[in-house]
A protein has these predicted regions:
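Conserved ABC transporter NBD signature motif
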Residues: 83-96
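Helix-to-loop junction immediately C-terminal to a conserved catalytic motif
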Residues: 76
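Conserved ABC ATPase signature
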Residues: 153-157, 161
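A short, proline-enriched helix->beta-strand linker immediately N-terminal to the Walker B motif
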Residues: 172-176
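Conserved ABC ATPase "signature" region
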Residues: 131-149, 201
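The feature captures the beta-strand-to-loop junction immediately N-terminal to the Walker
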Residues: 61-63
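Conserved structural motif at the start of ABC-family nucleotide-binding domains
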Residues: 30, 44-47
């Protein structure tokens, strides 16, 4: 913001000092302050604040066009912000290890690399030795119970196999934060159940903070510790709903009273915001 003094030589601008960064409450992993993003001159996010807790899965859900994917892309540094600040446990993004699972797995993998080399790619970028890479790859293969041939190229695999490999690659460097942008949107039901199970296993073993964008409310609630419900643009937080059913969650979870209540309340808030 600037103030203008109309003097004979034209306007004089004085920069207003940026307000001090206000940290989140204890247990916060990602702190967002004053986040602002414009598209075609219109605000998508304007002076947006959010605290994302550590060691939790937070699902992001909201109306079409509210900027769900844009939000996690800005947090992950894939989309520039116009103003604001984002810190990870008090650190900048460059000092934070992250993983990202893209919605379009067909474009996420390097087609000229074998699948096994795609998965190992972030480990090699870190400069890990061959022995370290081999050890971590063996852990991932065992964890995901991989049955398909990792020496094949991505385009030779099924959609579910490609997305499994994408998730393995995102988890390979053992990230502090894992971003998941509609990771189930192109998967069949059987593969969706498998990936849900594996993500929960990873979370229970590591406590990795996860941000999940989903267009499926049932899926968003099912995996979440918190459901972040967004408004229409300019986007605000409509409500953050806690959901605390024990893990691992299974198909039986879908009929539990607490799940049904949380899903119903989420739907009520969503419908209110869509009609706003």
């Amino acid at each position: 913001m600037r103030t203008t003094d109309n003097v004979i030589n034209g306007p004089v601008y004085a920069d207003v000092p940026k307000p001090a960064f206000v940290p989140g409450p204890a247990g916060t992993h990602i702190t967002i302050r004053g986040l602002t993003k414009y598209f075609a001159g219109w605000p998508l996010y304007e002076n947006f604040d959010l605290d994302i807790p550590k060691h939790r899965i937070v699902s992001v859900f909201g109306p079409n066009g509210c900027g769900k994917s844009t939000l996690i892309n800005m947090i992950a540094g894939l989309v520039p912000i116009d103003a604001g600040e984002i810190l990870f446990d008090g650190k900048s993004l460059k000092d934070t290890k992250i993983g990202y699972v893209f919605q379009n797995y067909r474009e996420a993998m390097f087609p000229w690399m074998r699948t096994i080399d795609n998965i190992a790619y972030p480990l090699k970028l870190e400069g890990r030795s061959k022995a370290q890479v081999d050890r971590r790859m063996a852990e991932l293969v065992a964890s995901f119970d991989v049955k398909f041939d990792l020496n094949r190229y991505p385009y030779e695999l099924s959609g579910g196999q490609q997305q499994t490999a994408s998730i393995m690659r995102a988890l390979a460097p053992e990230p502090e934060v894992l971003f998941l942008d509609e990771p189930f949107s192109a998967l069949d039901f059987e593969m969706t159940l498998f990936i849900r199970e594996k993500l929960q296993e990873v979370f229970m073993a590591t406590g990795t903070t996860m941000l999940l964008v989903s267009h499926d409310l049932e899926e968003a609630v099912y995996l979440a510790d918190q459901v972040l419900l967004l408004t229409k643009r300019p986007t605000r937080v409509a409500k953050i709903l806690p959901y605390g059913d024990a893990r691992p969650r299974t198909v039986d979870t879908l009929s539990e009273d607490s799940f049904v209540r949380t899903k119903k309340r989420s739907l009520e808030i969503f419908q209110r915001e869509v009609r706003r």
